Amino acid sequence: MKFTPSIVIDAPQYYVDHFNGKYNVDKCVILRDLQLETDSESMPSSLKHLTKPTHILDLTNNDLIMIPDLSRRDDIHTLLLGRNNIVEVDGRLLPMNVQNLTLSNNSIRRFEDLQRLRRAPRTLKNLTLIGNQVCHLANYREHVLRLVPHLETLDFQNVTAEERKSAMSFPRQADGDTLGPVNTAIRDNGSRDKTMEIMNLVVSKMTVERRNELKKQLAEATSLEEIARLEKLLSGGV
């Protein structure tokens, strides 16, 4: 489904207080579960209608293949893009004051797909990439921290001083990529298809009642950790 102005304008909105503990401060706009697709024409023009301020933008479980261009937005501090088909992360497209970015369960497979993450705003503190094949590559955390040294948490784990030191000591290749052995099994082109096959099998066996229960819990989730846990269950737990 393509983005349209009406979809953006009519998107459900609610306020949350779990980011700073203050009641009715952070406005969350919900554009999840709509099968929205990346489109170079309709997506940018439609997102211009996104209400302002929007502090949390939820685009979870759509068909996006790239991050939408939100670089002109100074109000969005949390961007939820889990369970899409994003293959490359371009930090230049992120909101200028983004602090929290969730990209769990996408199609990010190689370190090369993360290179433009180095252009992310320095405000980015919390990044989630769980469920992407790139997470299984050797020296994954060090590589990400080399690209985004100002991160405080990666995949819900605090970044340690030792990790920062290790990341900075990594040698670089001529093209700017950090060196490190790669798990060749992960690079197999068929591995993604196999993962999706398993995921579909697990989800198909889940009862409607169970799925509805998980969706209700997801709507009431009060932390990024809880959201990620429930999203993983809904996607089959793989």
Curated annotation (Swiss-Prot):
SUPFAM superfamilies: L domain-like. LRR repeats lie at residues 53-74, 75-95, 97-118. Belongs to the CWC complex (or CEF1-associated complex), a spliceosome sub-complex reminiscent of a late-stage spliceosome composed of the U2, U5 and U6 snRNAs and at least BUD13, BUD31, BRR2, CDC40, CEF1, CLF1, CUS1, CWC2, CWC15, CWC21, CWC22, CWC23, CWC24, CWC25, CWC27, ECM2, HSH155, IST3, ISY1, LEA1, MSL1, NTC20, PRP8, PRP9, PRP11, PRP19, PRP21, PRP22, PRP45, PRP46, SLU7, SMB1, SMD1, SMD2, SMD3, SMX2, SMX3, SNT309, SNU114, SPP2, SYF1, SYF2, RSE1 and YJU2. Interacts with MSL1. One of its GO terms (biological process) is U2-type prespliceosome assembly. One of its GO terms (cellular component) is Prp19 complex. It comes from Saccharomyces cerevisiae (strain ATCC 204508 / S288c) (Baker's yeast). GO terms for molecular function: U2 snRNA binding. Its main location: nucleus. Residues 167-189 are annotated as: Disordered. Belongs to the U2 small nuclear ribonucleoprotein A family. This is U2 small nuclear ribonucleoprotein A'. Present with 3630 molecules/cell in log phase SD medium. Involved in pre-mRNA splicing. Associates to U2 snRNA in a MSL1 dependent manner and is required for normal accumulation of U2 snRNA. Required for the spliceosome assembly and the efficient addition of U2 snRNP onto the pre-mRNA. It comes from the Eukaryota. Keywords: Leucine-rich repeat, mRNA processing, mRNA splicing, Nucleus, Repeat, Spliceosome.
